[in-house]
């Protein structure tokens, strides 16, 4: 019987299935960070349990770490406690960890693939919503809660119910100025934030196959924002080429065996999906969110939607509430919206490809950030990304234009460290969520691609980067 990619990943990891469909899944890799792991380790200590498979875990501090000068440590006592606790727990249990001043430190969903700890055919979990990122490698990856983090540490298994299969098929050549971020925002705009609820989404089609691994990770990263349990892309040469030579990846004869096995992780011809959604890449335009949900998104050449045109009273009320929070008037051209701050970073868009795309725009415009922009910051996704960008001189491109070049971490994506918006400030952000207060109490977030964020920094407002030539 023909199987989907999700079917194959699920079936190769089921240990036991109950009559009600609940399955015990074997977990190949658990990624840990400082926010959702302390209670899990405490549970192990209270029960006097060891970590079942130490080598299956990889830890890093990312949410609370400062992105400014780290020589003075962490100023906030709560953040310091969380980071110190992860350090102590990993030392006590013998878990591999990249500590704050390790060159390999970075955002958990960037360092996993970067190190080759994320591999095709794996089940991967982390106490973090955007674990779906790792599905770009033909893996089954999703976020879990803290009690489940403890369960995986203790047993290397997890209780789950199987999701339905969805295929999001994007065909055609992506227009100039459009990126993977625009693809996934367009998808969410089409199906909504509940469109993927109950599903595992496979992203396919010629447009997805043409993306780099960095682009595929961006798309899978935001599968959760469409309501899906997981997002994934089939294994191909692009996947294999990216992984070769990375630290955690098999070598020699084991590499050849692994590649042969990994290539099985694609949907079979004739495999049946419960839902299929199709998009024409040629119709995608650079995207900008206007509201307080990723589904509240439109094209840069459009206007802020008018709630009066929405027939559904529930949706109309949500639109009105969002516009009030965002301080936007209906029918305002998106290009006329001024911004106060710029954030280029996060597990969605802080890889070297993203940094290069933003730097290209800054260099092309050849001006400093606009006078109305109070802060423009670039936060690389890892120490290795930062070092690579500096070797290429990209840091100087940004600093010469008035941007701040920071240390790696989650930063302003969720404002758990000192990087945040003040009430009423408007930000062009390359992150993944634009909820109320996400980047700081009263902050107003617009989600865009790195190129769009860079252009907004220079111009002081959103611009259609297709016009830049």
Curated annotation (Swiss-Prot):
Function: Catalyzes the isomerization between 2-isopropylmalate and 3-isopropylmalate, via the formation of 2-isopropylmaleate.
Pfam families: Aconitase
Reactions listed under catalytic activity: (2R,3S)-3-isopropylmalate = (2S)-2-isopropylmalate
Taxonomy of the source species: Bacteria, Pseudomonadati, Pseudomonadota, Betaproteobacteria, Burkholderiales
CDD domains with a match to the protein in the record: IPMI (cd01583)
Cofactor note text: Binds 1 [4Fe-4S] cluster per subunit.
Subunit structure: Heterodimer of LeuC and LeuD.
Assigned keywords, A-Z: 4Fe-4S, Amino-acid biosynthesis, Branched-chain amino acid biosynthesis, Iron, Iron-sulfur, Leucine biosynthesis, Lyase, Metal-binding
SUPFAM superfamilies: Aconitase iron-sulfur domain
Protein name: 3-isopropylmalate dehydratase large subunit
Cofactor(s) the protein requires to work: [4Fe-4S] cluster
Annotated pathway: Amino-acid biosynthesis; L-leucine biosynthesis; L-leucine from 3-methyl-2-oxobutanoate: step 2/4
UniProt-listed InterPro entries: 3-IsopropMal_deHydase_lsu (IPR004430), Acnase/IPM_dHydase_lsu_aba_1/3 (IPR015931), Acoase/IPM_deHydtase_lsu_aba (IPR001030), Aconitase_4Fe-4S_BS (IPR018136), Aconitase_4Fe-4S_dom (IPR036008), IPM_dehydratase_rel_enz (IPR050067), IPMI_cat (IPR033941)
């Amino acid at each position: 019987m023909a199987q989907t990619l999700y079917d194959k990943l699920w079936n190769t990891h089921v240990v036991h299935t109950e009559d009600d469909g609940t399955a015990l899944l074997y977990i190949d890799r658990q990624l840990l960070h400082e926010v959702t792991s302390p209670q899990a380790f405490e549970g192990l200590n209270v029960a006097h349990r060891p970590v079942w498979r130490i080598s299956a875990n990889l830890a890093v501090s990312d949410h609370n770490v400062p992105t400014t000068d780290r020589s003075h440590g962490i100023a906030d006592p709560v953040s310091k406690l969380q980071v110190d606790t992860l350090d102590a727990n990993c030392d006590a249990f013998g878990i591999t960890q990249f500590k704050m001043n390790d060159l390999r430190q970075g955002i958990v969903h960037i360092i996993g693939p970067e190190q080759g700890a994320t591999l095709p055919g794996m089940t991967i979990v982390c106490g973090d919503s955007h674990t779906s990122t790792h599905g770009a490698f033909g893996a089954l990856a999703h976020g879990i809660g803290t009690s489940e983090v403890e369960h995986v540490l203790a047993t290397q298994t997890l209780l789950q119910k199987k999701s339905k299969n969805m295929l999001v098929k994007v065909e055609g050549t992506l227009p100039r100025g459009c990126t993977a971020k625009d693809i996934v925002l367009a998808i969410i705009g089409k199906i909504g934030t509940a469109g993927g609820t109950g599903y595992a989404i496979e992203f396919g089609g010629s447009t997805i196959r043409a993306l780099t691994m960095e682009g595929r990770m961006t798309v899978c990263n935001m599968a959760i924002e469409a309501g899906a349990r997981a997002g994934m892309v089939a294994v191909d040469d692009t996947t294999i080429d990216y992984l070769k030579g990375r630290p955690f990846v098999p070598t020699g004869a084991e590499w050849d065996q692994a590649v042969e096995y990994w290539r099985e992780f694609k949907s079979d011809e004739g495999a049946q999906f419960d839902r299929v959604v199709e998009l024409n890449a040629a119709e995608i335009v650079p995207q900008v969110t206007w509201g307080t949900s990723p589904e509240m998104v439109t094209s840069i050449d459009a206007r802020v939607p008018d709630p009066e045109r929405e027939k559904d009273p529930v949706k109309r009320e949500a639109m009105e509430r969002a516009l009030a929070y965002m301080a936007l008037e209906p029918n305002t051209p998106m290009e006329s919206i001024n911004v106060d701050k710029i954030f280029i970073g996060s597990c969605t868009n802080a890889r070297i490809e993203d940094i290069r795309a933003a730097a290209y725009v800054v260099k092309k415009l050849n001006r400093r950030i606009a006078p109305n922009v109070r802060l423009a910051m670039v936060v690389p996704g890892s120490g290795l990304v930062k070092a690579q960008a500096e070797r290429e001189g990209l840091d100087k491109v940004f600093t010469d234009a008035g941007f701040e070049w920071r240390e790696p971490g989650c930063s302003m994506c969720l404002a758990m460290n000192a990087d945040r918006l003040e009430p009423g400030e408007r930000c062009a952000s390359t992150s993944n969520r634009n909820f109320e207060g996400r980047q700081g109490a009263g902050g107003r977030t617009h989600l865009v691609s790195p190129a769009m964020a860079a252009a907004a920094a220079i111009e002081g407002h959103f611009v259609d980067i297709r016009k830049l030539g």
